[in-house]
Every structure is written in structure tokens, then in C-alpha cells.
Amino acid sequence: MTGLSYTEMEGCRNLLSLLDNDEIMALCDTITNRLVQPEDRQDAIRAILVYSQSVEELLRRRKVHREIIFKYLATQGVIIPPATEKHNLIQHAKDYWKKQLQPKLKETPEPVKTEDIRLSEQQEKEEKNAEKVDFRRLGEEFCQWFFELLNSQNPLLGPPQDEWGPQHFWHDVKLRFYYNTSEQNVIDYHGAEIVSLRLLSLVKEEYLFLSPNLDSHGQKYAASPHGLVMVGVAGTVHRGNTCLGIFEQIFGLIRCPFVENTWKIKFINLRIIGESSLAPGRLMKPAITFEPSDLEAFYNVNTLCGPVKYNSM
């Protein structure tokens, strides 16, 4: 798992953009031991960031030339003597990224009565807006969008309809992946890059197709007073013309305060059960099991991964 913070990852992404394509591909081969075969430049950069254990490990690579780090710092307004050695340039880059969060803290105003009034008015406005949200419609539209986008990344279905990536997730998103096929396992993934890549690999490398059950039994919705919306959906898992089993997926969504009518994924619980683990001789239609009362526990610990109910078709 990557050791880069979100700020370091974004900084390194901009720095790597200064390398040419051959250098990017060569660096990707070195870092991943040629175990990852990127389709293009952006795939290679994602792999470099994901598999780098630290900023030092990445920037000390011979393929990341001293001149590149110097040029990046110059574009960010960090003026350093041209003769500065590479290890000092790396430290300057690390220091620069650490400072990116500090201005936000300093800009926070001191609590005064007028500010309290503005905050109170803003909170009241947000609460009124929250009351206007149709969570059922939001959940239905989200599920349709999410699964169409994810499934479109399956190379067996032709070119993707839109770009998949970490931009659809909060940077500290969590994914809990439980699968019961030939073996049982639960694996946790953290961070937008890691989570987006793991979900992408299901359809792009394992050629799976997730078909959600969008009727009343296959979906449930709930919302917390803090603005978190929980969307649950069940469905079947396919590869080509073969049905491999069923899945249950629960999303936690939070509205993006900077972009109107935009929600991002805060956490996901994904449970896949292989056909061999289902009762033989029955066609099963999965149904979501969580109730609105489960929301508080799910919101606090994000560990709900209970058994799936089945309804005979």
C-alpha cells in the first residue's frame, strides 16, 4: 500500500507530468517490477504513485532527474539555487507539500459573534437543503450511474463511456471487500487511488460484470442528520454469459460542498458470494439486509458486513 499522503500524491503527480512518456513507462516498470502493464501514460502514473512506498523512494530514483525536481519547484514558485543537490531538492519538495495545508488553518477566523451568526445561518440553510433531497431518487440515480460507469471499463464491452478514477471518491475513502468463493476473506483498502484501482481491477482485469437488482427488494436508503447518505444495492455477478454468484454493496455518500449537486463516495462495503456457496438447485434473487436503524453503527465504525438474505425467484 502506498506510503504517500494525499498532498504528496498530488504533488508527485504534477512533478511526474514533467517527464516524457518513455521515462514514465520505464519508471513504472522499475517500481512495479514489470508486474503492471499500463495502457497509457495516466495508468502508468497511477501505478507509480500507488506502488511507491514513500516520497523519498520515488524521488531518489535515477529516472527522476535532479533537473525535473528543480523545474517542478520553480513552477510552484519555490526559488532555490540551481546548484542545489538532489537530496536537498527532495527535502524542499517535502517541505513545500507540508505547507500546503497550513494556510487553511491560519485562515480560520477567530470565533466572534458576527461569525457565529453567519455560521448559524449557513447551517440552517444547509439543513433546509438537506430536507429537500430526495434520497430515494438520489440512490436510484447513483446506482444507475455507478454501475454503468464501472461496467463500461470492462474491455469485453468496448471502449469506456467515461473516465473512471479517484475523482469520484473522497481522498480518505475506505473499501471493505468481503468475498466467499473458493475461499473466504475480508480485505480493507484505504485512499481514493487504492480504492478506485481495486474496483477497476474487478471489471478490467477479472472481466466481471455487476448487475444490480434495482427493484424495491434490491435497494435501500438511509440518511444521517450529518448529511451522510447510505445506499445499499444487491445484484448478480457475471463473467461473459456465466453467472458467478451474487453481491451486496453498501455506499456512504457525502455531498461535495464546492461543486453543486455533486456527491462523492466516503466508504464502500462490497460482499461477493460465489454460486458454489449458495443453496444448490435454486435461482436466487439477492436482497439488501440493512435497515435504517443500522445507519448509526455503520456511520460510526463502517464494519457492517452481515449475511445476505435471499428471495426465491
Swiss-Prot record:
Taxonomic superkingdom: Eukaryota
GO biological process, one term: apoptotic process
InterPro entries: NTF2-like_dom_sf (IPR032710), UPF_C3orf38 (IPR026698)
Chain segments carrying region Disordered: 105-125
Keywords: Apoptosis
Task performed by this protein: May be involved in apoptosis regulation.
Name used for this protein in its record: Uncharacterized protein C3orf38 homolog
Originating species: Bos taurus (Bovine)
